[in-house]
Amino acid sequence: MSSPARSPSVGGATPKQGARTPTRGIASQDVETPMRMGPGRAVRPSDNISLPPTSPGNISLPATSPARGLGANMSEIDLSSPLNYGTPSSMGSIRTPRSGIRGTPLRARPDIRTDKRIRQVAIGGGSGLEPIPEKGSETTDPVSESSQAPQLVVWGTNVVVSQCKSKFKSFIMRFIDPSAEQDEISENIDVNQPLYLQKLEEIHTLEEPYLNLNCAHLKTFDQDLYRQLICYPQEVIPGFDMAINEMFFERYPAALLEHQIQVRPFNADKTRNMRSLNPEDMDQLISISGMVIRSSNVIPEMREAFFSCNICSFSTTVEVDRGRINQPTLCTNCNTNHCFRLIHNRSEFTDKQLVKLQESPDDMAAGQTPHNVLLYAHNDLVDKVQPGDRVTVTGIYRATPLKTGGLSSSVKSVYKTHVDVVHFRKVDNKRLYEDEEGKDHIFPPERVELLQLLAKKPDIYDRLARAIAPSIYENDDIKKGILLQLFGGTKKKHATLGRQNFRSEIHLLLCGDPGTSKSQMLQYVFNLVPRSQYTSGRGSSAVGLTAYVTKDPETRQLVLQTGALVLADNGVCCIDEFDKMNDSTRSVLHEVMEQQTLSIAKAGIICQLNARTSILAAANPAESQWNKRKNIIDNVQLPHTLLSRFDLIFLVLDPQDEIFDKRLASHLVSLYYVTRHEEEDTMFDMSVLRDYIAYAREHLSPTLSDEAQQRLIQAYVDMRKVGAGRGQISAYPRQLESLIRLSEAHAKVRLSNQVELLDVEEAWRLHREALKQSATDPLSGKIDVGILTTGLSTAARKKRADLVAAIKENLKKKGKVLTVPYQKLFSDIKEGSQIMITREQFEDALKEVQDEGAIVVMGKNTIRIC
């Protein structure tokens, strides 16, 4: 059934086959097990406890006959150690790979391996505690073998192997959760049947050998077993693995899995803040939450080294013990010293990844900077999370000593901590589902039916818009624009047309008076979208938005640390105080907002990062209040090259109207006495909005119908005709692409794969409303898109041309004069003009004349004529 474990050979010797170990009488239930003095009490050198020199997976156990099966002799399985037990899937069967001693739960799971040297003891009838010998005895006592077997416990714990397995089996067989459908997103869960038996059936159907165990379920069923799991996870989890594999292969003997089923606990009650982790949490199961800020490449970690003799080609394997390989020194076949070489392609490796988790702002103490924790992910957990994900991590808290450096084997007294990850969970009911390529979320059929029913209602567009920031009064068009931004357009890639891709993300800019709920709108979207980032223009730098190079403390190599725009890939980046950004910071947004990429060339690292990010920005006017006599460029002091990349620009102004003020005050006061029934309605609307947007983004890719194409063409031509007679430009191709994206998003609101005429009409209406507010020339009162694209309206451009001509005419009248006083020229131009000329307008015109080479401005007081 199972064989003695192999340990690294001494002097190159190969492991020998052990014999049966005689048992030591009937187990006594009255003998207590040596335990730690509390869950945080570690073994100290002063305790005079000698531990045998074996690795965690190299503990021998009583051998049994291979002819025994799984039926009548299940007690033989109960005697086996949880640390080196071969599950039924590996007992002389080829159903699952990694059979034999290497396929045991502990050896197959680097996430629960420990550097502690664990041993087991048998509770005998009259001699107290006896350690299980490392190798089997050469003699076998058939009389003792037929007697009742002793109980096996793990040294230093109260974990009795057989009891642990039997309790967990009872939990699997009997636990019924009436709220199972709310725990994990699964289909066909019967709340009246044992939950985890149904999950075993899912494992058999999907052939995914992982069982997610909710610790809250275990706590309600068996408090003692739950406490053992929290305090001694590296000893208890392998026991759970054994029990679940036995049950699975008893129910499905012909099942074929990639490897043995692994239990992954989550939702541990011992959830800690990162700052409160202390030494009493060492080697215990913890759960912490935060945001992933960095993940390394996959690192191969050697688990078993293969050595071959250079003389006689004799081979042997050595397990890696605490990160070290004890290379054999003597070949037992040819008796040659120092002749072994390491064969890498025959050694066994496991995947490993370093993940850095940052403290979430909600858990951060006042006046503190975010705290970071280092995570190690192994095997299938590698690449499960990406930078920007908000996760809850369940794992084992570890501490490793720091080396003094050099060739010395001594270590420092200061320890370095990390978490060996057992389970990742990306769940936040307040947010939308994360949009991952190639991965769809599973919606129950009744939920899909509800969403389809809602989509058929004629007012679904208005109802979803009202669900956006319901605490903010009115601003209906702004909420509709944000709603369309959350849905997004259709992702298209047409490399044959000369363009790599067409942008599907929608960008919004909110400008207006202070105190008009712009920041609250940004905060709502930030709390709604999973991959979202919130930053302020005053506190952001160019490298903070893009990426910066830092030295990895683990590998001591230069690595690229991504910024807010890259972390918000496939999400929304909310930028408040957009007008307060400096020019170098704003310049990085040009490529991101149009090409959806970010080019980096720093410290020898040249790459192009994906930044498929929707920008939602808010800006305040430079004069603290919107000046209606100035255009948007003069009010917010933003470059026109950046403004032209926004699909919708809304003005949020204070109307200063008594009726509006009364309605607004009534709405604000009503927020303070909201009833419970209204709160439940709000939560329901939030849940519906979350599922509705996620379903539309994943399953719909609307395309233009013939009617929609013709209407878009006509709308663009009409927009161009508006200012053609006056020399104004009222539309650019960017405005047409914005209309297409908005139309596709509106089709997603209807859960339709076809963009119809009504979608184009609503997109055109919303786009025109935004242009009426942001691109209206205050002098003429007409829409002039040139304000957004060139920074000047047609009237301002004509006024500057007239001013330049007047300056040239005045200089010609000077004759042979070489220099002209600055103030005198300004006075002459001002007196000769019929319209008012400001000093800023005069300086702009003078700069244009200087660019033509007609004059040279010398200092601030003199102008030299060329």
UniProtKB/Swiss-Prot annotation:
Record-listed ATP binding positions = 512-519
- Which InterPro entries does the protein's record reference? AAA+_ATPase, MCM, MCM_4, MCM_CS, MCM_dom, MCM_lid, MCM_N, MCM_OB
Q: Note the SMART domains from the entry.
A: AAA, MCM
Q: Please report the name of this protein according to its UniProt entry.
A: DNA replication licensing factor MCM4
Q: What result is annotated for mutating residue 518 to A? A: Slightly reduces complex helicase activity
The superkingdom listed in its UniProt entry is Eukaryota
Name the predominant localization. nucleus
Location(s) in or outside the cell: Nucleus
Q: Where is this region: Disordered?
A: 1-67, 81-107, 124-145
Q: How does it assemble?
A: Component of the Mcm2-7 complex. The complex forms a toroidal hexameric ring with the proposed subunit order Mcm2-Mcm6-Mcm4-Mcm7-Mcm3-Mcm5.
Q: Which GO terms describe its biological process?
A: DNA replication; DNA strand elongation involved in DNA replication; double-strand break repair via break-induced replication; mitotic DNA replication initiation; mitotic spindle organization; premeiotic DNA replication
* Assigned EC number: 3.6.4.12
**Motif Arginine finger per record, residues:** 644-647
Q: Which UniProt keywords are present, listed alphabetically?
A: ATP-binding, DNA replication, DNA-binding, Helicase, Hydrolase, Nucleotide-binding, Nucleus, Phosphoprotein
One of the entry's Gene Ontology molecular-function terms is: ATP hydrolysis activity
Q: What does the function comment of this entry state?
A: Acts as a component of the Mcm2-7 complex (Mcm complex) which is the putative replicative helicase essential for 'once per cell cycle' DNA replication initiation and elongation in eukaryotic cells. The active ATPase sites in the Mcm2-7 ring are formed through the interaction surfaces of two neighboring subunits such that a critical structure of a conserved arginine finger motif is provided in trans relative to the ATP-binding site of the Walker A box of the adjacent subunit. The six ATPase active sites, however, are likely to contribute differentially to the complex helicase activity.
Query: What single Pfam family name could you report for this chain, choosing any that match?
Result: MCM_N
Residues bearing the modification Phosphoserine:
55, 81
Q: Gene name on record?
A: dpa
